[in-house]
C-alpha cells in the first residue's frame, strides 16, 4: 500500500471515529429528553406523579439492560454498518414518537386539545385515566428507544475493531465513549430551552431527528 493510500485510510478512520462520537452524543441526549421535560412540561398535562415518572424510568432501565444482552449478537448477525444504521433508526424513531403521546392520549380520552387535558381536576377519575394512558404510551416509546440505543456501544466497539489497528483502538474507543459525557452535558443546556420556546414535543422531535441526519 502506497504512503498516500495509507494516509487516506488513516484519515478516513478518524472521520469514522468522529461519527461514532456524534452518534454516542445523540444517543445520550435522546434518553435525557424525558428527564429534562417531565416535571415542568409533561406532568401538568398528563397529571403525572413522581411514581409515574419512576415507573417509566425504571422500566426503561430494565428494557435497556435486556436489550443489551441481544444487541451485540444482532450487530454480528446483521453486519456492523447495517446493524448500526438499524439501531440508530430505531432509537431515533422511538425518540420522535414521544412527541405524539399527547395527541394520542387526547384522542383516546375524547378531548379536543392538550390544554383541555391540563384543565382536568387533579385526582379525579378523568385525571387518573389520562395519567394511566399517557404512561403506557410513553412506556411504549421508551421500549423502542431502549432497544435501539442498546445497539450503540456494541456497534461502535466493533467499528473500532474493524477499522483501527491495535495501537489506536484504545484511543479511538476513548474518543467515542466521551460522547456519552458530552451528551449528558449538552442535554441540560439545550433541551429545556427547546421545550420552553417550542414545546416539549419539539424537544423530542429535534433531538430525535439528529439521528436521522447522522444516517
State each model region's role:
Residues 32, 61-69, 184-185:
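Residue-level signature of mid-helix packing/kink "hotspots" within the transmembrane helices
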Residues 141-181:
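Cytoplasmic helix-loop-helix junction between adjacent transmembrane helices
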Residues 67-79:
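Helix-to-loop junctions at the C-terminal end of transmembrane segments
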Residues 176-215:
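Helix-loop-helix hairpin linking two adjacent transmembrane segments in secondary transporters
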Residues 15-50:
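Extracytoplasmic
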Residues 89-131:
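C-terminal ends and interior cores of transmembrane alpha-helices
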Residues 37-65, 112, 116-123, 130:
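Extracellular/periplasmic helix-loop-helix junction of adjacent transmembrane segments
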Amino acid at each position: 500500500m502506497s504512503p498516500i493510500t495509507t494516509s487516506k485510510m488513516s484519515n478516513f478512520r478518524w472521520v469514522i471515529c468522529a461519527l461514532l462520537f456524534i452518534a454516542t452524543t445523540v444517543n445520550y441526549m435522546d434518553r435525557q429528553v424525558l428527564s429534562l421535560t417531565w416535571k415542568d412540561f409533561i406532568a401538568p398535562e398528563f397529571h403525572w406523579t413522581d411514581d409515574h415518572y419512576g415507573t417509566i424510568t425504571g422500566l426503561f432501565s430494565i428494557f435497556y439492560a435486556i436489550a443489551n444482552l441481544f444487541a451485540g449478537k444482532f450487530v454480528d448477525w446483521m453486519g456492523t454498518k447495517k446493524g448500526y444504521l438499524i439501531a440508530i433508526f430505531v432509537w431515533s424513531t422511538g425518540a420522535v414518537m414521544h412527541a405524539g403521546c399527547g395527541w394520542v392520549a387526547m384522542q383516546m380520552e375524547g378531548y379536543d386539545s392538550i390544554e383541555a387535558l391540563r384543565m382536568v381536576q387533579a385526582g379525579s377519575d378523568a385525571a387518573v385515566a389520562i395519567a394511566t394512558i399517557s404512561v403506557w404510551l410513553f412506556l411504549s416509546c421508551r421500549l423502542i428507544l431502549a432497544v435501539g440505543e442498546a445497539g450503540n456501544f456494541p456497534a461502535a466497539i466493533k467499528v473500532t475493531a474493524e477499522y483501527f489497528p491495535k495501537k489506536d483502538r484504545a484511543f479511538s474507543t476513548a474518543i467515542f465513549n466521551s460522547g456519552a459525557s458530552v451528551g449528558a452535558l449538552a442535554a441540560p443546556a439545550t433541551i429545556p430551552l427547546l421545550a420552553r420556546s417550542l414545546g416539549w414535543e419539539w424537544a423530542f422531535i429535534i433531538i430525535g431527528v439528529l439521528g436521522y441526519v447522522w444516517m
